Swiss-Prot record:
Top enzyme class: transferase
GO biological process terms on file: fatty acid biosynthetic process
Designated gene of the protein: fabH
Family listed: Belongs to the thiolase-like superfamily. FabH family.
GO molecular function: 3-oxoacyl-[acyl-carrier-protein] synthase activity; beta-ketoacyl-acyl-carrier-protein synthase III activity
CDD domains: KAS_III (cd00830)
Reaction catalysis annotation: malonyl-[ACP] + acetyl-CoA + H(+) = 3-oxobutanoyl-[ACP] + CO2 + CoA
Predominant location category: cytoplasm
Name listed for the protein in its UniProt record: Beta-ketoacyl-[acyl-carrier-protein] synthase III
Signal peptide location: none
Length: 317
């Protein structure tokens, strides 16, 4: 038994900050940002717009797209690094907003790899027969973790949410396989310099960009090659490759190593920057809304995040 995605939705806050606008208060410019990242703009949530609020907007769109009753949902997983509060979880607040009494809900924290981790967890839970319909969300207010004087990091991130509804598959569609990995020894490559038990603050993002670029390409490449090999697939079988939308240079280098044709690679980072765990479901929602995905298409997800955490998922639409 496996599960399949029956609906998806994305949400980006209305406030948009272009590279030119960013250059008014950060020592940078549009050409510098575009050349190094491929990003042209990012969306920024308002001061009173929290992760749970943007998660709700994406969840409502996914529920509508799946054409199900909200009461069919029997589990909620929210993948986030930027919860409203240290506790309770974003997922439990979302459960309340949706009016789902007693439905188990929890947050999953694997940073930018969170959605891929969530896919594996959701698939395992549905495959066990314990749950039938899972709401899986990636939602982030990454701008709350930015040092706006650090041009190496503040240009990279944005706020947003993406969501999917997963149900048991009774045919050959759905999650074919997935893999997830971690390497805690590499945590200093990307982290925040704060935390509740460390200093009582959320901290700001610290990143070793060159090391992260190299490891991102290396780890995702290895994960994908292993996943394809274990399931007797080749790159030529892939109809759409949806990688984590962190940086277009990472995406292009990974696609080059895999020898994936450019028209199969989904790139949305230009319009919303790195939304961490929300980036893959946002990209999926964008391409689904375009009408390009057909039943039977083979889709590949891959992501890497702080931790380090990384992994990939293969599915048949």
């Amino acid at each position: 038994m496996t599960c399949k995605i029956i609906g998806c939705g994305g949400y980006l806050p209305p406030k948009v900050v272009s590279n030119d606008e960013l250059a008014k208060f950060v020592d940078t410019n549009d050409e510098w940002i575009r050349t190094r990242t491929g990003i042209s703009q990012r969306h920024i949530a308002g001061d009173t717009e929290y992760t749970s609020h943007i998660a709700l907007k994406a969840a409502e769109k996914a529920i509508a797209d799946a054409d199900i009753s909200v009461n069919e949902i029997d589990l909620i997983i929210t993948c986030t690094t930027t919860p409203d509060n240290s506790f309770p979880s974003v997922a439990t607040k979302l459960q309340s907003y949706l009016g789902l009494n007693n439905v188990p809900s929890f947050d999953l924290q694997a940073v930018c790899a969170g959605f891929v981790y969530g896919v594996q967890v959701a698939n395992s839970l549905i495959s066990s027969g314990k749950y039938k319909t899972i709401l899986l969300i990636g939602a982030e207010k990454m701008t709350s973790l930015l040092d706006w004087e650090d041009r190496a990091t503040c240009v990279l991130f944005g706020d947003g949410a993406g969501s999917v509804i997963l149900q048991r598959s009774d045919d050959n569609s759905g999650i074919i396989d997935s893999n997830i990995f971690s390497s805690g020894a590499d945590y200093e490559i990307l982290y925040t310099n704060g935390g509740v038990s460390m200093n009582g603050s959320s901290g700001k993002i610290i990143m070793q960009g060159q090391k992260l670029f190299r490891l991102a390409v290396e780890k995702m490449h290895q994960s994908i090659e292993e996943l394809l090999r274990n399931n007797n697939f080749t790159v030529n079988d892939i109809d759409y490759f949806i990688p984590h939308q962190a940086n277009v240079r990472i995406i292009n280098k990974l696609a080059e190593l895999l020898n994936v044709e450019d028209h199969k690679v989904v790139k949305t980072v230009e319009k919303h920057a790195n939304c961490s765990a929300a980036s893959i479901p946002l990209a999926l929602s964008t391409i689904k809304a375009s009408g390009k995905i057909k039943k039977g298409d083979i889709i590949l997800f891959s992501a890497i995040g702080a931790g380090l955490t990384w992994g990939s998922a293969l599915l048949r639409w």
